[in-house]
Amino acid sequence: MRNHPGGLEFIVMALILVFEGLGAPVVRGAQDTSKNLTLKLRTRVEPFKGSGDWREVNFEGRFPVNSTAIVICDMWDKHWCSGATARVEVLARKMVPLIDRARASGVQIIHAPSDVVGLYNQYPQRIRILGIPVTEAPPSLDLPNPPLPIDDSDGGCDTGEKFYQAWSRENPAISITGDDVISADGKEIYSFLAQRGIKNLLIMGVHANMCILNRSFAIKQMTKWGIRCVLVRDLTDSMYNPKDRPYVSHDQGTQLVIEYIEQYWCPSMLSTDLAQALPR
């Protein structure tokens, strides 16, 4: 009898099979591989359930360009927390060349600046998504929703400010152009994905423990509707104050949230791997 692979090797093989041919059936010898993105993904598994012993697993997933979109979540011009504003500025500068290259390669770009979408009502990119026929989303999957590994109950600001609505638009460094669309409504975005045959979302922006997880267009709800999400983990940040549990640095708090997402919601990837995978 042939030996079966065990443990993590079996898990990796299973993950590769799941992600093989995302978005469309694969016809061997007939697919145009130049229009696939082969991305290095990271997830976390608990081989012995209930043990609390989580293992990092790295694997590759293949994403057809025409069934993949980037969602830019809440990358505003200003945040009520000055520390968050400063970190978002750094993220925006990193995002811009990647977004521009992805757009040029045929990846759909979705701008999702919550609370300020009305500013863009006359933009063709906003009008485009408003013209999409409504597609009813399926019943949401009943998935576990464990608590976060950090305490963000005070808003998570590490520079002392109190909440006010500071944002007025998406960060101006990020271009809105071409075939992009603008929406911060999960049902609008789901209808757009359904019409375009998009099954995979690469999600970047802020904040990992709040909007990235909880917006109607973001990881939790899209996953519950059967959309395959991937967090771009080096293009996100958290709202976490090191004065709160578990009393680690801000960056360590962000990493804990990323690991939580990998454990319970979706894989993550690096922006550098996406840049490398994009057709040149």
Language model: regions and residue ranges:
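Short catalytic helix/loop segments, enriched in acidic residues and glycine
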Residues: 94
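Boundary at the C-terminal end of the N-terminal hydrophobic targeting segment
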Residues: 23, 29-30
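Carbohydrate-interacting regions of secretory-pathway proteins
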Residues: 121
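Active-site-adjacent betaalpha module
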Residues: 30-69, 86-88, 97, 104-106, ...
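A cross-domain feature marking catalytic cores of carbohydrate-active enzymes
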Residues: 75, 111-114, 233
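Bacterial N-terminal signal peptides
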Residues: 9-21
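Acidic/histidine-rich, surface-exposed loop or edge segments in extracytoplasmic proteins
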Residues: 68-83
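N-terminal secretory signal peptides that target proteins for export/translocation
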Residues: 1-6
